[in-house]
């Protein structure tokens, strides 16, 4: 991570940390870096989610892009993976998404995609940061005829919707409940699943700029669970604010997280001989039960640090086509370059249709170990140094010794927020609570803030 770029672009409180001035510079400098090797006039696609600050930041970002001669295609409200798909499929120079994903409405973020549809690597981000920190802006300032054009491009959303529909199966007769988190999926999920023929019940589809992720979506699936139970839906599908995540709900109202979704899709692909190298890429946060289920099926796994960018790096490096995170980021590389909640939803319903099994039956093949995760607010300057604090290091070692190999502990910094995450897994809830609470109390005493 750099000074400005975290694990998922530049994020901060809108108009306080992520200001219009910074957005303009990111557009200007980011656009310049990403278009240096273009033989034709560069084209950049820009999308946003439904946050009230989105249009403000979009206007500033677009101005920066236009100022270095880049043609900008405004996609409007669209899922982050929709931007990635369109950049690659339409051979654009780059893409930019304005979103803070699952964060609350007061936050926003800006993330870049290269012309290949993948998020930027560290080297490109550092190039942009160097320009941001330069004492003077020395980039070219073209006169009127050299400025970029601004194009509204609503067709992009329709093309993305049609593409996702083309990857699925007819769902005639299936009752699907959707929760679009009052976010980016509110412009697309209804149409996608209607085109597939599903009977729909939808919540979280009325964004007002302030209610994105508010008690809805993949981080708050309780409302969808209730809707599924009351409506008799066969499946519930909850997206986050920018629709790069999916959390599902089975017909009984029980949660099906990213680990189970990856297992279900991965086993399906493996049985068809379509799981590249018979391997799923996952992170250190995946549940022990997920690993045991893969072992039982003879499916290999590659484990990375937390963050979908690290999963994607591993997939690209070794030619894998399925990976993701427990949080619901699922990357299906045969179809898109990044985590795509709506794509994952289409593929999950496809497995249900092809196998004729209920989601609860498919998910029951993974027995999840009790897991507890506690987030502790700390200073940003301390979250990467926690393991250097003697008391924290000692209590973790003591808890691991007590586990005696039957469970695990993970303490890590958030990539996007001033938080230290303490996670444990063990055979019983009582043990998990004991391990996590013991460590969390020491962390709070040593480096926690109110």
Curated annotation (Swiss-Prot):
One of its GO terms (molecular function) is phosphoglucosamine mutase activity. Binds 1 Mg(2+) ion per subunit. GO terms for cellular component: cytosol. The active site is at 101 (phosphoserine intermediate). It catalyses: alpha-D-glucosamine 1-phosphate = D-glucosamine 6-phosphate. HAMAP family: GlmM_B. The modification Phosphoserine is found at residue 101. The keyword Protein biosynthesis does not apply. InterPro entries: A-D-PHexomutase_a/b/a-I (IPR005844), A-D-PHexomutase_a/b/a-I/II/III (IPR016055), A-D-PHexomutase_a/b/a-II (IPR005845), A-D-PHexomutase_a/b/a-III (IPR005846), A-D-PHexomutase_C (IPR005843), A-D-PHexomutase_C_sf (IPR036900), A-D-PHexomutase_CS (IPR016066), Alpha-D-phosphohexomutase_SF (IPR005841). Keywords: Isomerase, Magnesium, Metal-binding, Phosphoprotein. This is Phosphoglucosamine mutase. It holds the Pfam family PGM_PMM_II. Mg(2+) binds at residues 101, 240, 242, 244. NCBIfam families: glmM, PRK10887.1. Belongs to the phosphohexose mutase family. Catalyzes the conversion of glucosamine-6-phosphate to glucosamine-1-phosphate. Its cofactor is Mg(2+). The keyword DNA-binding does not apply. GO terms for biological process: carbohydrate metabolic process; peptidoglycan biosynthetic process; UDP-N-acetylglucosamine biosynthetic process. Activated by phosphorylation. Its EC number is 5.4.2.10.
